[in-house]
Swiss-Prot record:
Identification of the protein by name: 5-oxoprolinase subunit A
Recorded family membership: Belongs to the LamB/PxpA family.
Keywords for this protein: ATP-binding, Hydrolase, Nucleotide-binding
This enzyme's EC code(s): 3.5.2.9
Molecular functions per Gene Ontology: 5-oxoprolinase (ATP-hydrolyzing) activity; ATP binding
Keyword Nucleotide-binding applies: yes
Subunit field text: Forms a complex composed of PxpA, PxpB and PxpC.
Chemical reaction(s) catalysed: 5-oxo-L-proline + ATP + 2 H2O = L-glutamate + ADP + phosphate + H(+)
Stored InterPro entries: Glyco_hydro/deAcase_b/a-brl, LamB/YcsF/PxpA-like
Gene Ontology biological process terms in this record: carbohydrate metabolic process
Organism: Cupriavidus metallidurans (strain ATCC 43123 / DSM 2839 / NBRC 102507 / CH34) (Ralstonia metallidurans)
Record's keyword annotation contains ATP-binding: yes
HAMAP family from the UniProt entry: PxpA
Length: 246
């Protein structure tokens, strides 16, 4: 058995270089919610040095709120936003002799795509039109996966190590009780359950079937590095290899 470990990087959190030694896929901010050209380039160099699969992490144009504020934008504007950001990061990757592998929307753009089909279709169309060989990362069991597959893209169903789940398989909204698992042991056990047993316990105690192909580790917490090391060790002890597998 194998699993991909991904993290959102290039967001100015200071752990990037060390985290890249522990993960298999990096989602690099494209400057619209965090980072800038210099940060993007440096993160790309670190990722290539660690042989980590590189992906674009496009967002709404929302640096003030780290891309976590929902915006009502026309689908064509979102299409242009995403296309622009993918192209910017791809330029950095190509200049260093690498190859862009995937795209994962960020923050509110990701969460809205779970429930807004037209928004999701615009994101997926931008990915497909830029490069139909790119892999699309989306929330496991959600319409993001269905829409991307219908467009002919390869997908990876994403689960979250430290986020709470609703009974319908969506993530508990940030800022509400149960949204984040502060206890590392809870997050570790949840990850193992999703990867090995293909199920997750929702906040109401019910078990929800889930397909895990890539696990997101948040890189902006105070204990991000320690948790990444623990999760690698725990998965390794279960005989689960860490690989991007694109």
């Amino acid at each position: 058995m194998q699993i991909d470990l991904n993290a959102d990087l290039g967001e100015g959190c200071g752990n990037d270089e060390a985290l890249l030694a522990l993960i298999s896929s990096a989602n690099i901010a494209c400057g619209w919610h965090a980072g800038d050209a210099a940060t993007m380039l440096q993160t790309v160099k670190w990722a290539l040095a660690n042989k980590v699969s590189i992906g674009a992490h496009p967002s709404f144009p929302d640096r003030e709120n780290f891309g976590r504020t929902e915006m009502q934008r026309d689908p064509e504007a979102v299409y242009a936003d995403v296309l622009y950001q993918i192209g910017a990061l791809d330029a950095m990757v190509r200049a260093q002799g690498g190859e862009l592998a995937h795209v994962k929307p960020h923050g509110a753009l990701y969460n809205m795509a779970v429930r807004d089909a037209k928004l999701c279709e615009a994101i997926v169309r931008a990915v497909r039109d830029y490069d139909s060989d790119l892999v699309f990362f989306g929330l496991a069991n959600s319409q993001m996966i269905d829409i991307a597959r219908a467009a002919g893209l390869r997908v990876k169903e994403e689960v979250f190590a430290d986020r709470g789940y609703n009974p319908d398989g969506t993530l508990v909204k940030r800022g509400t009780p149960g949204a984040l698992h502060e206890d590392e042991d809870v997050a570790l056990n949840q990850t193992l359950s999703m990867v090995r047993d293909k199920q997750v316990r929702a906040i109401d105690g019910t078990w929800v079937p889930i397909r895990a192909e890539t696990v997101c580790l948040h890189g902006d917490g105070a204990h991000a590095l320690a948790f990444a090391r623990r999760i690698r060790e725990r998965l390794g002890a279960e005989g689960i290899a860490i690989r991007a597998g694109n």
